[in-house]
Amino acid sequence: MKALTSALVLLFSVAAHAGDARQLAKLPAPAEATLREEMLDNLVTLNEILGLVVAGKVKEAGEVAEKKLGTSTMGRHRNKPFEARPGPHMPPAMHELAMKGHQAATAFAAVAATGDREKTLAALPTLNSACVSCHLAYRVR
């Protein structure tokens, strides 16, 4: 049974990538692990921001956006070994999208800091546009 399960997992993973036209960004294993952990953290943060906006806590949502996603977070991996730092191993266009994502979070934070709920809601889709663009264009596996 274990062999059958393993074969099915392999078959489905090969089939899943067969139609995947995204560019493979081959990163060293430690950098890939760092990036995947960061992406999961970003999803949790986006969910937190959405919850705060819905609750009417737009200023707090902006603070979270800057603290966890904004330009102030750039370079957070600088103390890791080079092989564990995703940025230097990314294709240049992928790295540019990552920078745009940080910049978008900072721009969203500035809008949210005004406390204007309507403007914050209007800015919300820009918060993850670079994320979506990057995930549509690149994969690490």
Regions found by a protein language model. Give the residues of each.
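N-terminal signal peptide c-region/cleavage motif recognized by signal peptidases
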Residues: 13-18
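Sequence context surrounding c-type heme c attachment/ligation sites in exported
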Residues: 19-141
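Residues in flexible loops and secondary-structure boundaries
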Residues: 9-12, 61
